[in-house]
Each structure stands twice: as C-alpha cells, then as structure tokens.
Amino acid sequence: MTRTEIWNKAEKALFEKYGESPDISIVNRFLSEKRFLADYGVAEYFDELAGICRESIDKYNEKLIAKNTVSCSLAAYLLGASEINPLPPHYYCKTCKRVEWVEDEKCLFDKRSTRRCECGAEMQIDGYDIPWETYLPYAQRLKAKDPVPENYKDLFEALTKKHFQWSLLGAAQAVNLLGQATGISPDEIDLNDREVKYRLLGGDFICMHPKLAEFLKQAYAVVHPCSYAELLKLIGLAHGTGTWKHNAEDLLKNGKCRLADIPATRDELYMDLQLDMIIYRQNETGFALDVADKARNGYYLKHGMDNYTVEMLYELRYDDWFIDYLLRTNYMSTKAFSVMELKYFILLTWYQTYYPKQYAEVIGNDIIW
C-alpha cells in the first residue's frame, strides 16, 4: 500500500467516526499531522503496526499495544496502531456524528462516560488531549536518506520495533480475560465509576503494578490527589527519571507550587509552553517543542540551560522553581503511556470491585507486568 493510500485509509476512518463533515478542529488536527509527518514515512510504520496488532488478536487472542510516542498521533489511532484518541476530551454520537467538547476537565476519566445527544441517542466520551508535535522529533530521526540495504533489513526491523515499543501488557490481557469471564466488555464500563474512583483516590492500589503502587503510596504522603487528573500527574512523574525524588517531591513539600503546576510529561510541558508563547508572544516559533524535547532526554541536567531559554521562560512568567525542575529532570515520559496505564488499572479495579469471584479465578496473582 502506498503512502497516499495509507493516508486516505486514515481519512476514511476519520469520516466513519466523525461523519462526512467533522468538526473543523478535528480536520485541522488531521491535516496538520498529514502536512508535517507525511514526508517522514510514519504512516507506513503506523499501518504495519496496526496490522501486527490485529494479527495478534486474530491468531493468538492476545492484545498487543503500541505505547509511548506513537499514541500521540491521530493518524496512528485512526489506522488502529494505537487505542488512545489524542484529541481533546469530547462526547461524540455514533448515530448523528455530533461532537460536544468537554471544556472543564483535563482528564476524561473525571467525567461520566455517556451523555444524551440531541438526536436521542447516547453519546460516548473520548479524547485524552495529547499533541502530535511531540512525535515530530522522533519522525525526523526515523527518516533515512538512503534505502536500507537488504542485509540490514532484520536489524532495521528490530530497531523499528524497539522504537515503537510494541509490548503485550499483562494488564491488557487480564482485562480481556475478565471481559470474557464476566460477559461485561471493558468498552461497556463507566471509567468514572464512583466506587472505583473512591478506591483508587483513597489509596487502594491492589490492582496496580507493584512498583507503581509503592511509588504512589509514598507520593500520597506528600500530596493526595482529588481527581483522576491529579493521579495521572503522579503516574507521569513515576515513569520519569529525576522528575520526582529531589525534584517535584521537594517542590510540593516546600510549598513552591501545586501538583497541577508541574508538567509531569513531555506532552504537558510542550502544551503549557506553546499556550504561553501564544498568550505572551502572539506566536510559537518552535521554542516549546525544543524545550520539551531537551527536557525529555535530560539535556538540561547534563549541559545546563542557555541564557536565551532562561530569559524566555522568565518572559513567559515562569518562576525559578520551574527552571530548577527542568534542570533536575533526566527523562520525561509520555502522557499516552500514563493514560493507558491508568485506564487499565481503573478497569481491573472495576472488575475486582463488582466481580471479585471471577477476578480471583481468572487473575489471581498471575498478571505478568
């Protein structure tokens, strides 16, 4: 399949989900990705990955998940390479294709899963608000000037797979098995279930990865989240390196900032800076993406921060604690991975809450993290 055919395939999927005349912001998002990413050949990777994911389900009944950076792309989602819709939170109607944006929440897990549409049908909530621009540095590094020699094809494929981090998550497979055992599909579950939310925000991490559960127990002693949006922040900090210990933890303990002020992932950092560039400078020159990419790989920790960046951050009304936070950060994870992880923990906790017998029979202690 040619590059053009793959993008046409993604466009067709867009129309199937959002109708023949999608909301203009959805169209702009898709066209922006197509304009900037098409030349790097990422659509071919997305399509290949989607095929592997489908094959894993068809042949082995196992869910294969592409995590991290690939999940920031709307095209990847439309092609089936990612299950994370990166658009801002919104309700959409499968019947009339109406879209209603959620303006008052940063995390759709904090909103009820359904709403009644004007046409009388039930609207579903979707969208995790992840920018595609954070994928651009990866796309640029992927593009090769010369064809890959035949004798290096296997190595190239191995590196490609590593780059996209194709992984079978134990939690995803566990949710799939629980859906079969209970007859309740994960797609039918309200992700804002009151009892489940009470358990997770209250510190009940029995269905979580042991290492993450241990981190959250310690983090809850410093700051107790009141919403899934705040819990998502903590999960993002947990997957970073140098983002929590002797950094965000100390900032919160010393009252330098609130949890909501801290960019836990590279995507949040980019979006915050991009918005402030537009507000205070009336333009976005690439500064936000440059800072986010350097913070992502610990550039500022290793090399320090140049005067231009420091002066620009001050101009954008950022305080010293924010600059110190970036200087101490060694690696920033992706929002998509945190979103996916929290989603599966919510689903597992739901099954454990309402179907404890089936949960014990199917899962027990056999989740392979």
Where are the regions that the model predicts?
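A generic structural signal for ordered alpha-helices
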Residues: 15, 27-34, 213, 251, ...
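Helix-rich "cap/lid" substructures immediately adjacent to catalytic or cofactor-binding pockets
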Residues: 20-65
